[in-house]
């Protein structure tokens, strides 16, 4: 059985979402967002930097949400959540699958750092405002592309899990920024 190590409100949500879509049985171990949870020697044996998500699938232990999702699709996709490489949808699937980590998550990470992770005295309003502006610019093409569509490539795919989860994370990221009047 697959074991998913996660901390709530992290990229591990993408992996859990895909596992649910694929109807794969899995076990969850929730690690607290603390030094004892993520930086423990036990967890660092799974991920040297003490990050999540990590899955264990038999002898395989793999981290990074995109890599995990690709692995799960290649091994277990029985729902067609990844188009065939020869299909006309495939290039767009790849584009949107990777867009979230390349364009959406970098400014979101800065917003989280500036509103949640850093102590108040180390936060920089200029960095926060720049990140908010970049995030808006990064989301505009997504909004435009999805106009009149339900999904990124016609039917629901793993690209929707990747990018959709990033958009879901905006709910708590935006709340943190709103609390600071950004």
Please annotate each region the language model reported.
Residues 1-129, 133-136:
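GST-like domain detector, emphasizing the conserved glutathione-binding G-site
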Residues 139-153:
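Hydrophobic alpha-helical bundle segments that form small-molecule/ligand-binding pockets
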Residues 61, 98, 157, 175-176:
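Hydrophobic transmembrane-helix microenvironments that flank and shape a buried ionizable site
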Residues 172-182:
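Single conserved hydrophobic/aromatic residue that forms the stacking wall/gate
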Residues 107-110, 151-171:
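GST superfamily/GST-like fold recognition
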């Amino acid at each position: 059985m697959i074991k998913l190590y996660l901390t709530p409100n992290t990229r591990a949500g993408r992996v859990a979402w895909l596992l649910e879509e694929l109807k794969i049985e899995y076990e969850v171990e929730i690690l607290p967002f603390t030094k004892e949870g993520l930086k423990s020697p036990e967890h660092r044996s799974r991920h040297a930097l003490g990050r999540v998500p990590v899955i264990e699938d038999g002898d395989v232990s793999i981290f990074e949400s995109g890599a995990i999702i690709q692995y799960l699709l290649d091994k277990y996709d029985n729902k067609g959540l990844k188009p065939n490489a020869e299909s006309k949808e495939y290039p767009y699937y790849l584009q949107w699958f990777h867009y979230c980590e390349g364009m959406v998550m970098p400014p979101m990470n800065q917003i989280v750092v500036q509103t949640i992770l850093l102590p108040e005295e180390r936060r920089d309003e200029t960095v926060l405002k720049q990140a908010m502006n970049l995030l808006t610019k990064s989301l505009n093409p997504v909004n435009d592309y999805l106009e009149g569509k339900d999904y990124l490539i016609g039917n629901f795919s793993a690209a929707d899990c990747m990018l959709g989860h990033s958009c879901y994370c905006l709910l708590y990221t935006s709340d943190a920024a709103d609390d600071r009047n950004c």
